[in-house]
Amino acid sequence: MIDLGISKLALIGAVALVVIGPERLPKVARTAGALIGRAQRYIADVKAEVSREIELEELRKMRTEFEEAARNVEQTIHQEVSRHTSEINERLNEALGDPASRQTATQAAEWRPAPAKSRNGRNSWRNKQLAMPKWYRRKQGVRMWAQSGAARVKRHRPPIVAAQSRGRSFFE
């Protein structure tokens, strides 16, 4: 940063007093202080954001390393399992001498795990709404269709009995 001693600050203050004047100097000093504070906060925010980005990049690298290590472990396990199954099948074929069992042994050695299924549609709003059981939706009062206020009042108003309505006439 800039080296400002007391003598330099006094010189700057004297020049500012002469140039700006004693009436406007406090207002200008407050404005300058506010601008310097904003600049310092902006610099601190930029530093924090840069450090966060660096940490995120390191985490991404670590994640890819872990995923690669997991894939390697899965492949080695699969290779060992297939090697052992082929050995077992060979010994079984030697013991039984059945040609049909030899075909199943080769098919077992060629077995590969199914690829992971994509989760298409799981994040859609409609699927989330329809995932709840109907009895739970009814009990909790989850509305599936829009209904106007008048229709809702009519739906929840108790029915008028015919005997009560005859006694209350406008003309009586």
Swiss-Prot record:
Gene Ontology CC terms, in alphabetical order: TAT protein transport complex
Gene3D superfamilies associated with the record: 1.20.5.3310
Main location: membrane
Residue numbers spanned by region Disordered: 97-129
The organism's place on the tree of life at top rank: Bacteria
Keyword vocabulary terms for this entry: Cell inner membrane, Cell membrane, Membrane, Protein transport, Translocation, Transmembrane, Transmembrane helix, Transport
Membrane topology: Single-pass membrane protein
UniProt-annotated location(s): Cell inner membrane
Membrane spanning residue stretches: 1-21
Pfam families on file: TatA_B_E
InterPro entries given in the database record: TatA/B/E, TatB
GO terms, molecular function: protein transmembrane transporter activity
Nuclease listed as a keyword: no
Cysteine pairs bridged by disulfides in the record: none
Gene Ontology terms describing biological process: protein transport by the Tat complex
Family, similarity comment: Belongs to the TatB family.
Complex formation: The Tat system comprises two distinct complexes: a TatABC complex, containing multiple copies of TatA, TatB and TatC subunits, and a separate TatA complex, containing only TatA subunits. Substrates initially bind to the TatABC complex, which probably triggers association of the separate TatA complex to form the active translocon.
Function: Part of the twin-arginine translocation (Tat) system that transports large folded proteins containing a characteristic twin-arginine motif in their signal peptide across membranes. Together with TatC, TatB is part of a receptor directly interacting with Tat signal peptides. TatB may form an oligomeric binding site that transiently accommodates folded Tat precursor proteins before their translocation.
The protein's name in its UniProt record: Sec-independent protein translocase protein TatB
Recorded name of the encoding gene: tatB
